[in-house]
C-alpha cells in the first residue's frame, strides 16, 4: 500500500510540474508568431517564431485560387507580403484577422487594369452557424478570397498572432 501511495504521489507531482510549465510557457509569450506563411498550392498556413514552426493548419482559399488576386470579386486569394493589421471579434465568420491587402503593388496593378483591387481579405473561421462542419471545410475552396480555418483553429491562432505580424502568401 505504501509503495502504491508513493507511486501515485510521484505521478501527481509530475502532472503538476508539467501543468505549471505549460502555463509558464503561455504566460511568458513563448508562443507568439513573428511571421505567417501561406502556401496556396499546399493549402497550408504556418505560424513561425524565429524561423521555427509553431503550428501548421490546413486551409480553404478563394474559389478560384490559382494566381494572384487581380480585382474585386475574382475569387482569388492574394499573393505577396502583407501584415495582420486588425481583428474582428464580431465577424460573420466566427473570428477574423484582417490582412493588409491591397498593398501598393496590388493597387498599381488594379489601376492599370482599371478595376477595384478588392479588400477585406481575412484569416477567419467558419460562417456563423456552420462551425459543425469543422475540418470538412477544406474539401474544397469556398471563400471569396480569404483564408479559412476551423473555428477552433482561429481561436488558437488569434492569441498567437499580434497585430503587425507579417504574412507572406505564396502561390
Model segments located where?
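Bacterial N-terminal signal peptides that target proteins for export
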Residues: 2-13
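Bacterial N-terminal signal peptides
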Residues: 12-22
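Short beta-strand/loop turn elements enriched in aromatics
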Residues: 12-13, 47, 132-134
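Intrinsically disordered, low-complexity
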Residues: 25-57, 61-67, 72, 171
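N-terminal post-signal-peptidase region of extra-cytosolic proteins
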Residues: 28-34, 61-86, 105-109, 151-152
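Exported/periplasmic cell-wall-interacting domains
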Residues: 31, 86-171
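Well-ordered beta-strand positions in beta-sheet-rich domains
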Residues: 35, 56-58, 81, 120, ...
Amino acid at each position: 500500500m505504501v509503495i502504491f501511495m508513493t507511486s501515485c504521489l510521484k505521478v501527481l507531482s509530475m502532472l503538476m510540474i508539467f501543468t505549471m510549465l505549460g502555463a509558464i510557457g503561455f504566460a511568458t509569450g513563448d508562443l507568439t508568431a513573428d511571421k505567417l506563411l501561406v502556401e496556396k498550392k499546399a493549402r497550408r498556413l504556418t505560424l513561425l517564431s524565429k524561423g521555427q514552426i509553431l503550428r501548421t493548419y490546413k486551409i480553404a482559399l478563394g474559389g478560384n485560387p490559382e494566381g494572384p488576386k487581380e480585382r474585386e470579386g475574382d475569387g482569388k486569394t492574394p499573393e505577396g507580403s502583407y501584415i495582420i493589421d486588425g481583428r474582428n471579434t464580431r465577424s460573420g465568420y466566427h473570428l477574423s484577422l484582417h490582412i493588409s491587402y491591397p498593398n501598393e503593388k496590388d493597387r498599381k496593378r488594379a489601376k492599370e487594369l482599371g478595376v477595384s483591387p478588392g479588400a477585406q481579405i481575412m484569416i477567419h473561421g467558419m460562417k456563423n452557424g456552420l462551425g459543425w462542419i469543422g475540418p470538412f471545410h477544406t474539401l474544397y475552396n469556398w471563400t471569396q478570397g480569404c483564408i479559412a480555418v476551423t473555428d477552433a483553429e482561429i481561436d488558437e491562432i488569434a492569441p498567437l498572432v499580434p497585430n503587425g505580424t507579417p504574412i507572406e502568401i505564396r502561390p
